[in-house]
């Protein structure tokens, strides 16, 4: 019997210098990298897993966006959805100032559209209203506004980078057709994650972004003033990889795959299985809190 042993040789420690270091090569991380590279910055992404994609590659639906050019290619027939949302806002969230204000604005927009029904009806405020109701009213209104107000621009940005999500359909949590999905050469709707991630990776390669796989960041480096100036990571053979940078971007997602951390913040989820990618271990949160960052809503966990 011959035993084949894995190569246990430890690689040499290394140091890389860049303008920007990004932790996590999922959809957010690669988007940030492409954007920074487009501004002439040198970019390094540190990714703990052997492949890019994170949770994004697991997404099978599409991307929600309001007031897009692709929505206008559809005939509007979702009056009942709008009416139901306005009724829900009035009956269940009358004491929520944000939802009440959004519902008032949407009611005015809806009345104006009914008086002159041109194009496809949707608005940033209706998307905000749907999102606030979907979050049971505990969402951060400012973050919801940022998400919704920039959603159409995000669809346009993807288009500019050869990633087209032009099939618009209905989906849970939306009053109108708002989910944008990719279509293959045969005209069949396909999973957004497996479509988008390879194209984002291709854009990273074209932009000269360096992606370090199997490299787990475990410390944010700071200067004497407390400013983030890089990260320290561990490579696949245990070697130390130091990335010095002028800016650090954390796009590590949550901690749904770290069951100990899940139970710590929400004990009733003990024993639950997760749909998260293996890399969702909460490293980014732990690194950030180690240098003084605060946390919020830690019990709101995507399992």
Regions found by a protein language model. Give the residues of each.
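N-terminal, intrinsically disordered, polar/charged segments of Gram-positive cell-envelope systems
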Residues: 2-13
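Beta1/beta-strand and adjacent pyrophosphate-binding region of the FAD-binding site
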Residues: 11-28, 44
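Glycine-rich FAD pyrophosphate-binding loop
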Residues: 38-59
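Glycine-rich loop(s) and the adjacent beta-strand/alpha-helix scaffold that form part
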Residues: 236-239, 243-303
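Short, solvent-exposed loop/turn and secondary-structure capping segments
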Residues: 54-58, 68, 75, 170, ...
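Conserved redox-cofactor binding core of oxidoreductases
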Residues: 120-239, 258-261
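Gly/Ala-rich phosphate-binding loop of Rossmann-like dinucleotide-binding domains
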Residues: 33, 37
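N-terminal glycine-rich dinucleotide-binding loop that anchors FAD/FMN and/or NAD(P) in oxidoreductases
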Residues: 58-93
């Amino acid at each position: 019997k011959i035993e084949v042993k894995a190569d246990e040789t430890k690689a040499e420690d290394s140091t890389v210098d860049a303008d920007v270091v990004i932790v996590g090569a999922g959809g957010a991380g690669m988007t940030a990298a492409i954007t920074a590279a487009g501004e002439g910055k040198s970019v390094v992404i540190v990714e703990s897993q052997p492949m890019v994609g994170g949770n994004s590659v697991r997404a099978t639906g599409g991307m929600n966006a309001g007031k897009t050019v692709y929505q206008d290619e559809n005939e509007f027939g979702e009056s009942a959805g709008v009416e139901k949302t306005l009724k829900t806002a009035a009956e269940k969230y009358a004491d929520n100032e944000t939802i009440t204000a959004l519902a008032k604005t949407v009611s005015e927009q809806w009345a104006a559209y009914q008086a002159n029904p041109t194009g496809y009806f949707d608005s940033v405020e209706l998307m905000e209203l749907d999102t606030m109701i979907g979050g049971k009213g505990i969402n951060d209104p400012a973050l919801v506004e940022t998400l919704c107000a920039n959603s159409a621009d995000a669809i346009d940005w993807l288009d500019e980078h050869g990633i087209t999500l032009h099939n618009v359909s209905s989906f849970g949590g939306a009053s109108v057709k708002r989910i944008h999905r990719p279509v293959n050469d045969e005209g069949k709707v396909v999973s957004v994650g497996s479509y988008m991630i390879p194209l984002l990776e291709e854009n990273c390669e074209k932009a000269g972004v360096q992606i370090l796989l199997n490299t787990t960041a475990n410390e944010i480096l700071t200067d004497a003033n407390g400013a983030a100036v890089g990260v320290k990571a561990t490579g696949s053979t245990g070697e130390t990889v130091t990335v010095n940078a002028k800016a650090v971007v954390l796009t590590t997602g949550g901690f749904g795959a770290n069951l100990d951390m899940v139970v710590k913040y929400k004990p009733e989820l003990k024993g639950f299985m997760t749909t998260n990618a293996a890399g969702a271990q909460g490293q980014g949160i732990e690194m950030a809190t180690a240098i003084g960052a605060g946390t919020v809503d830690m019990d709101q966990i995507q399992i």
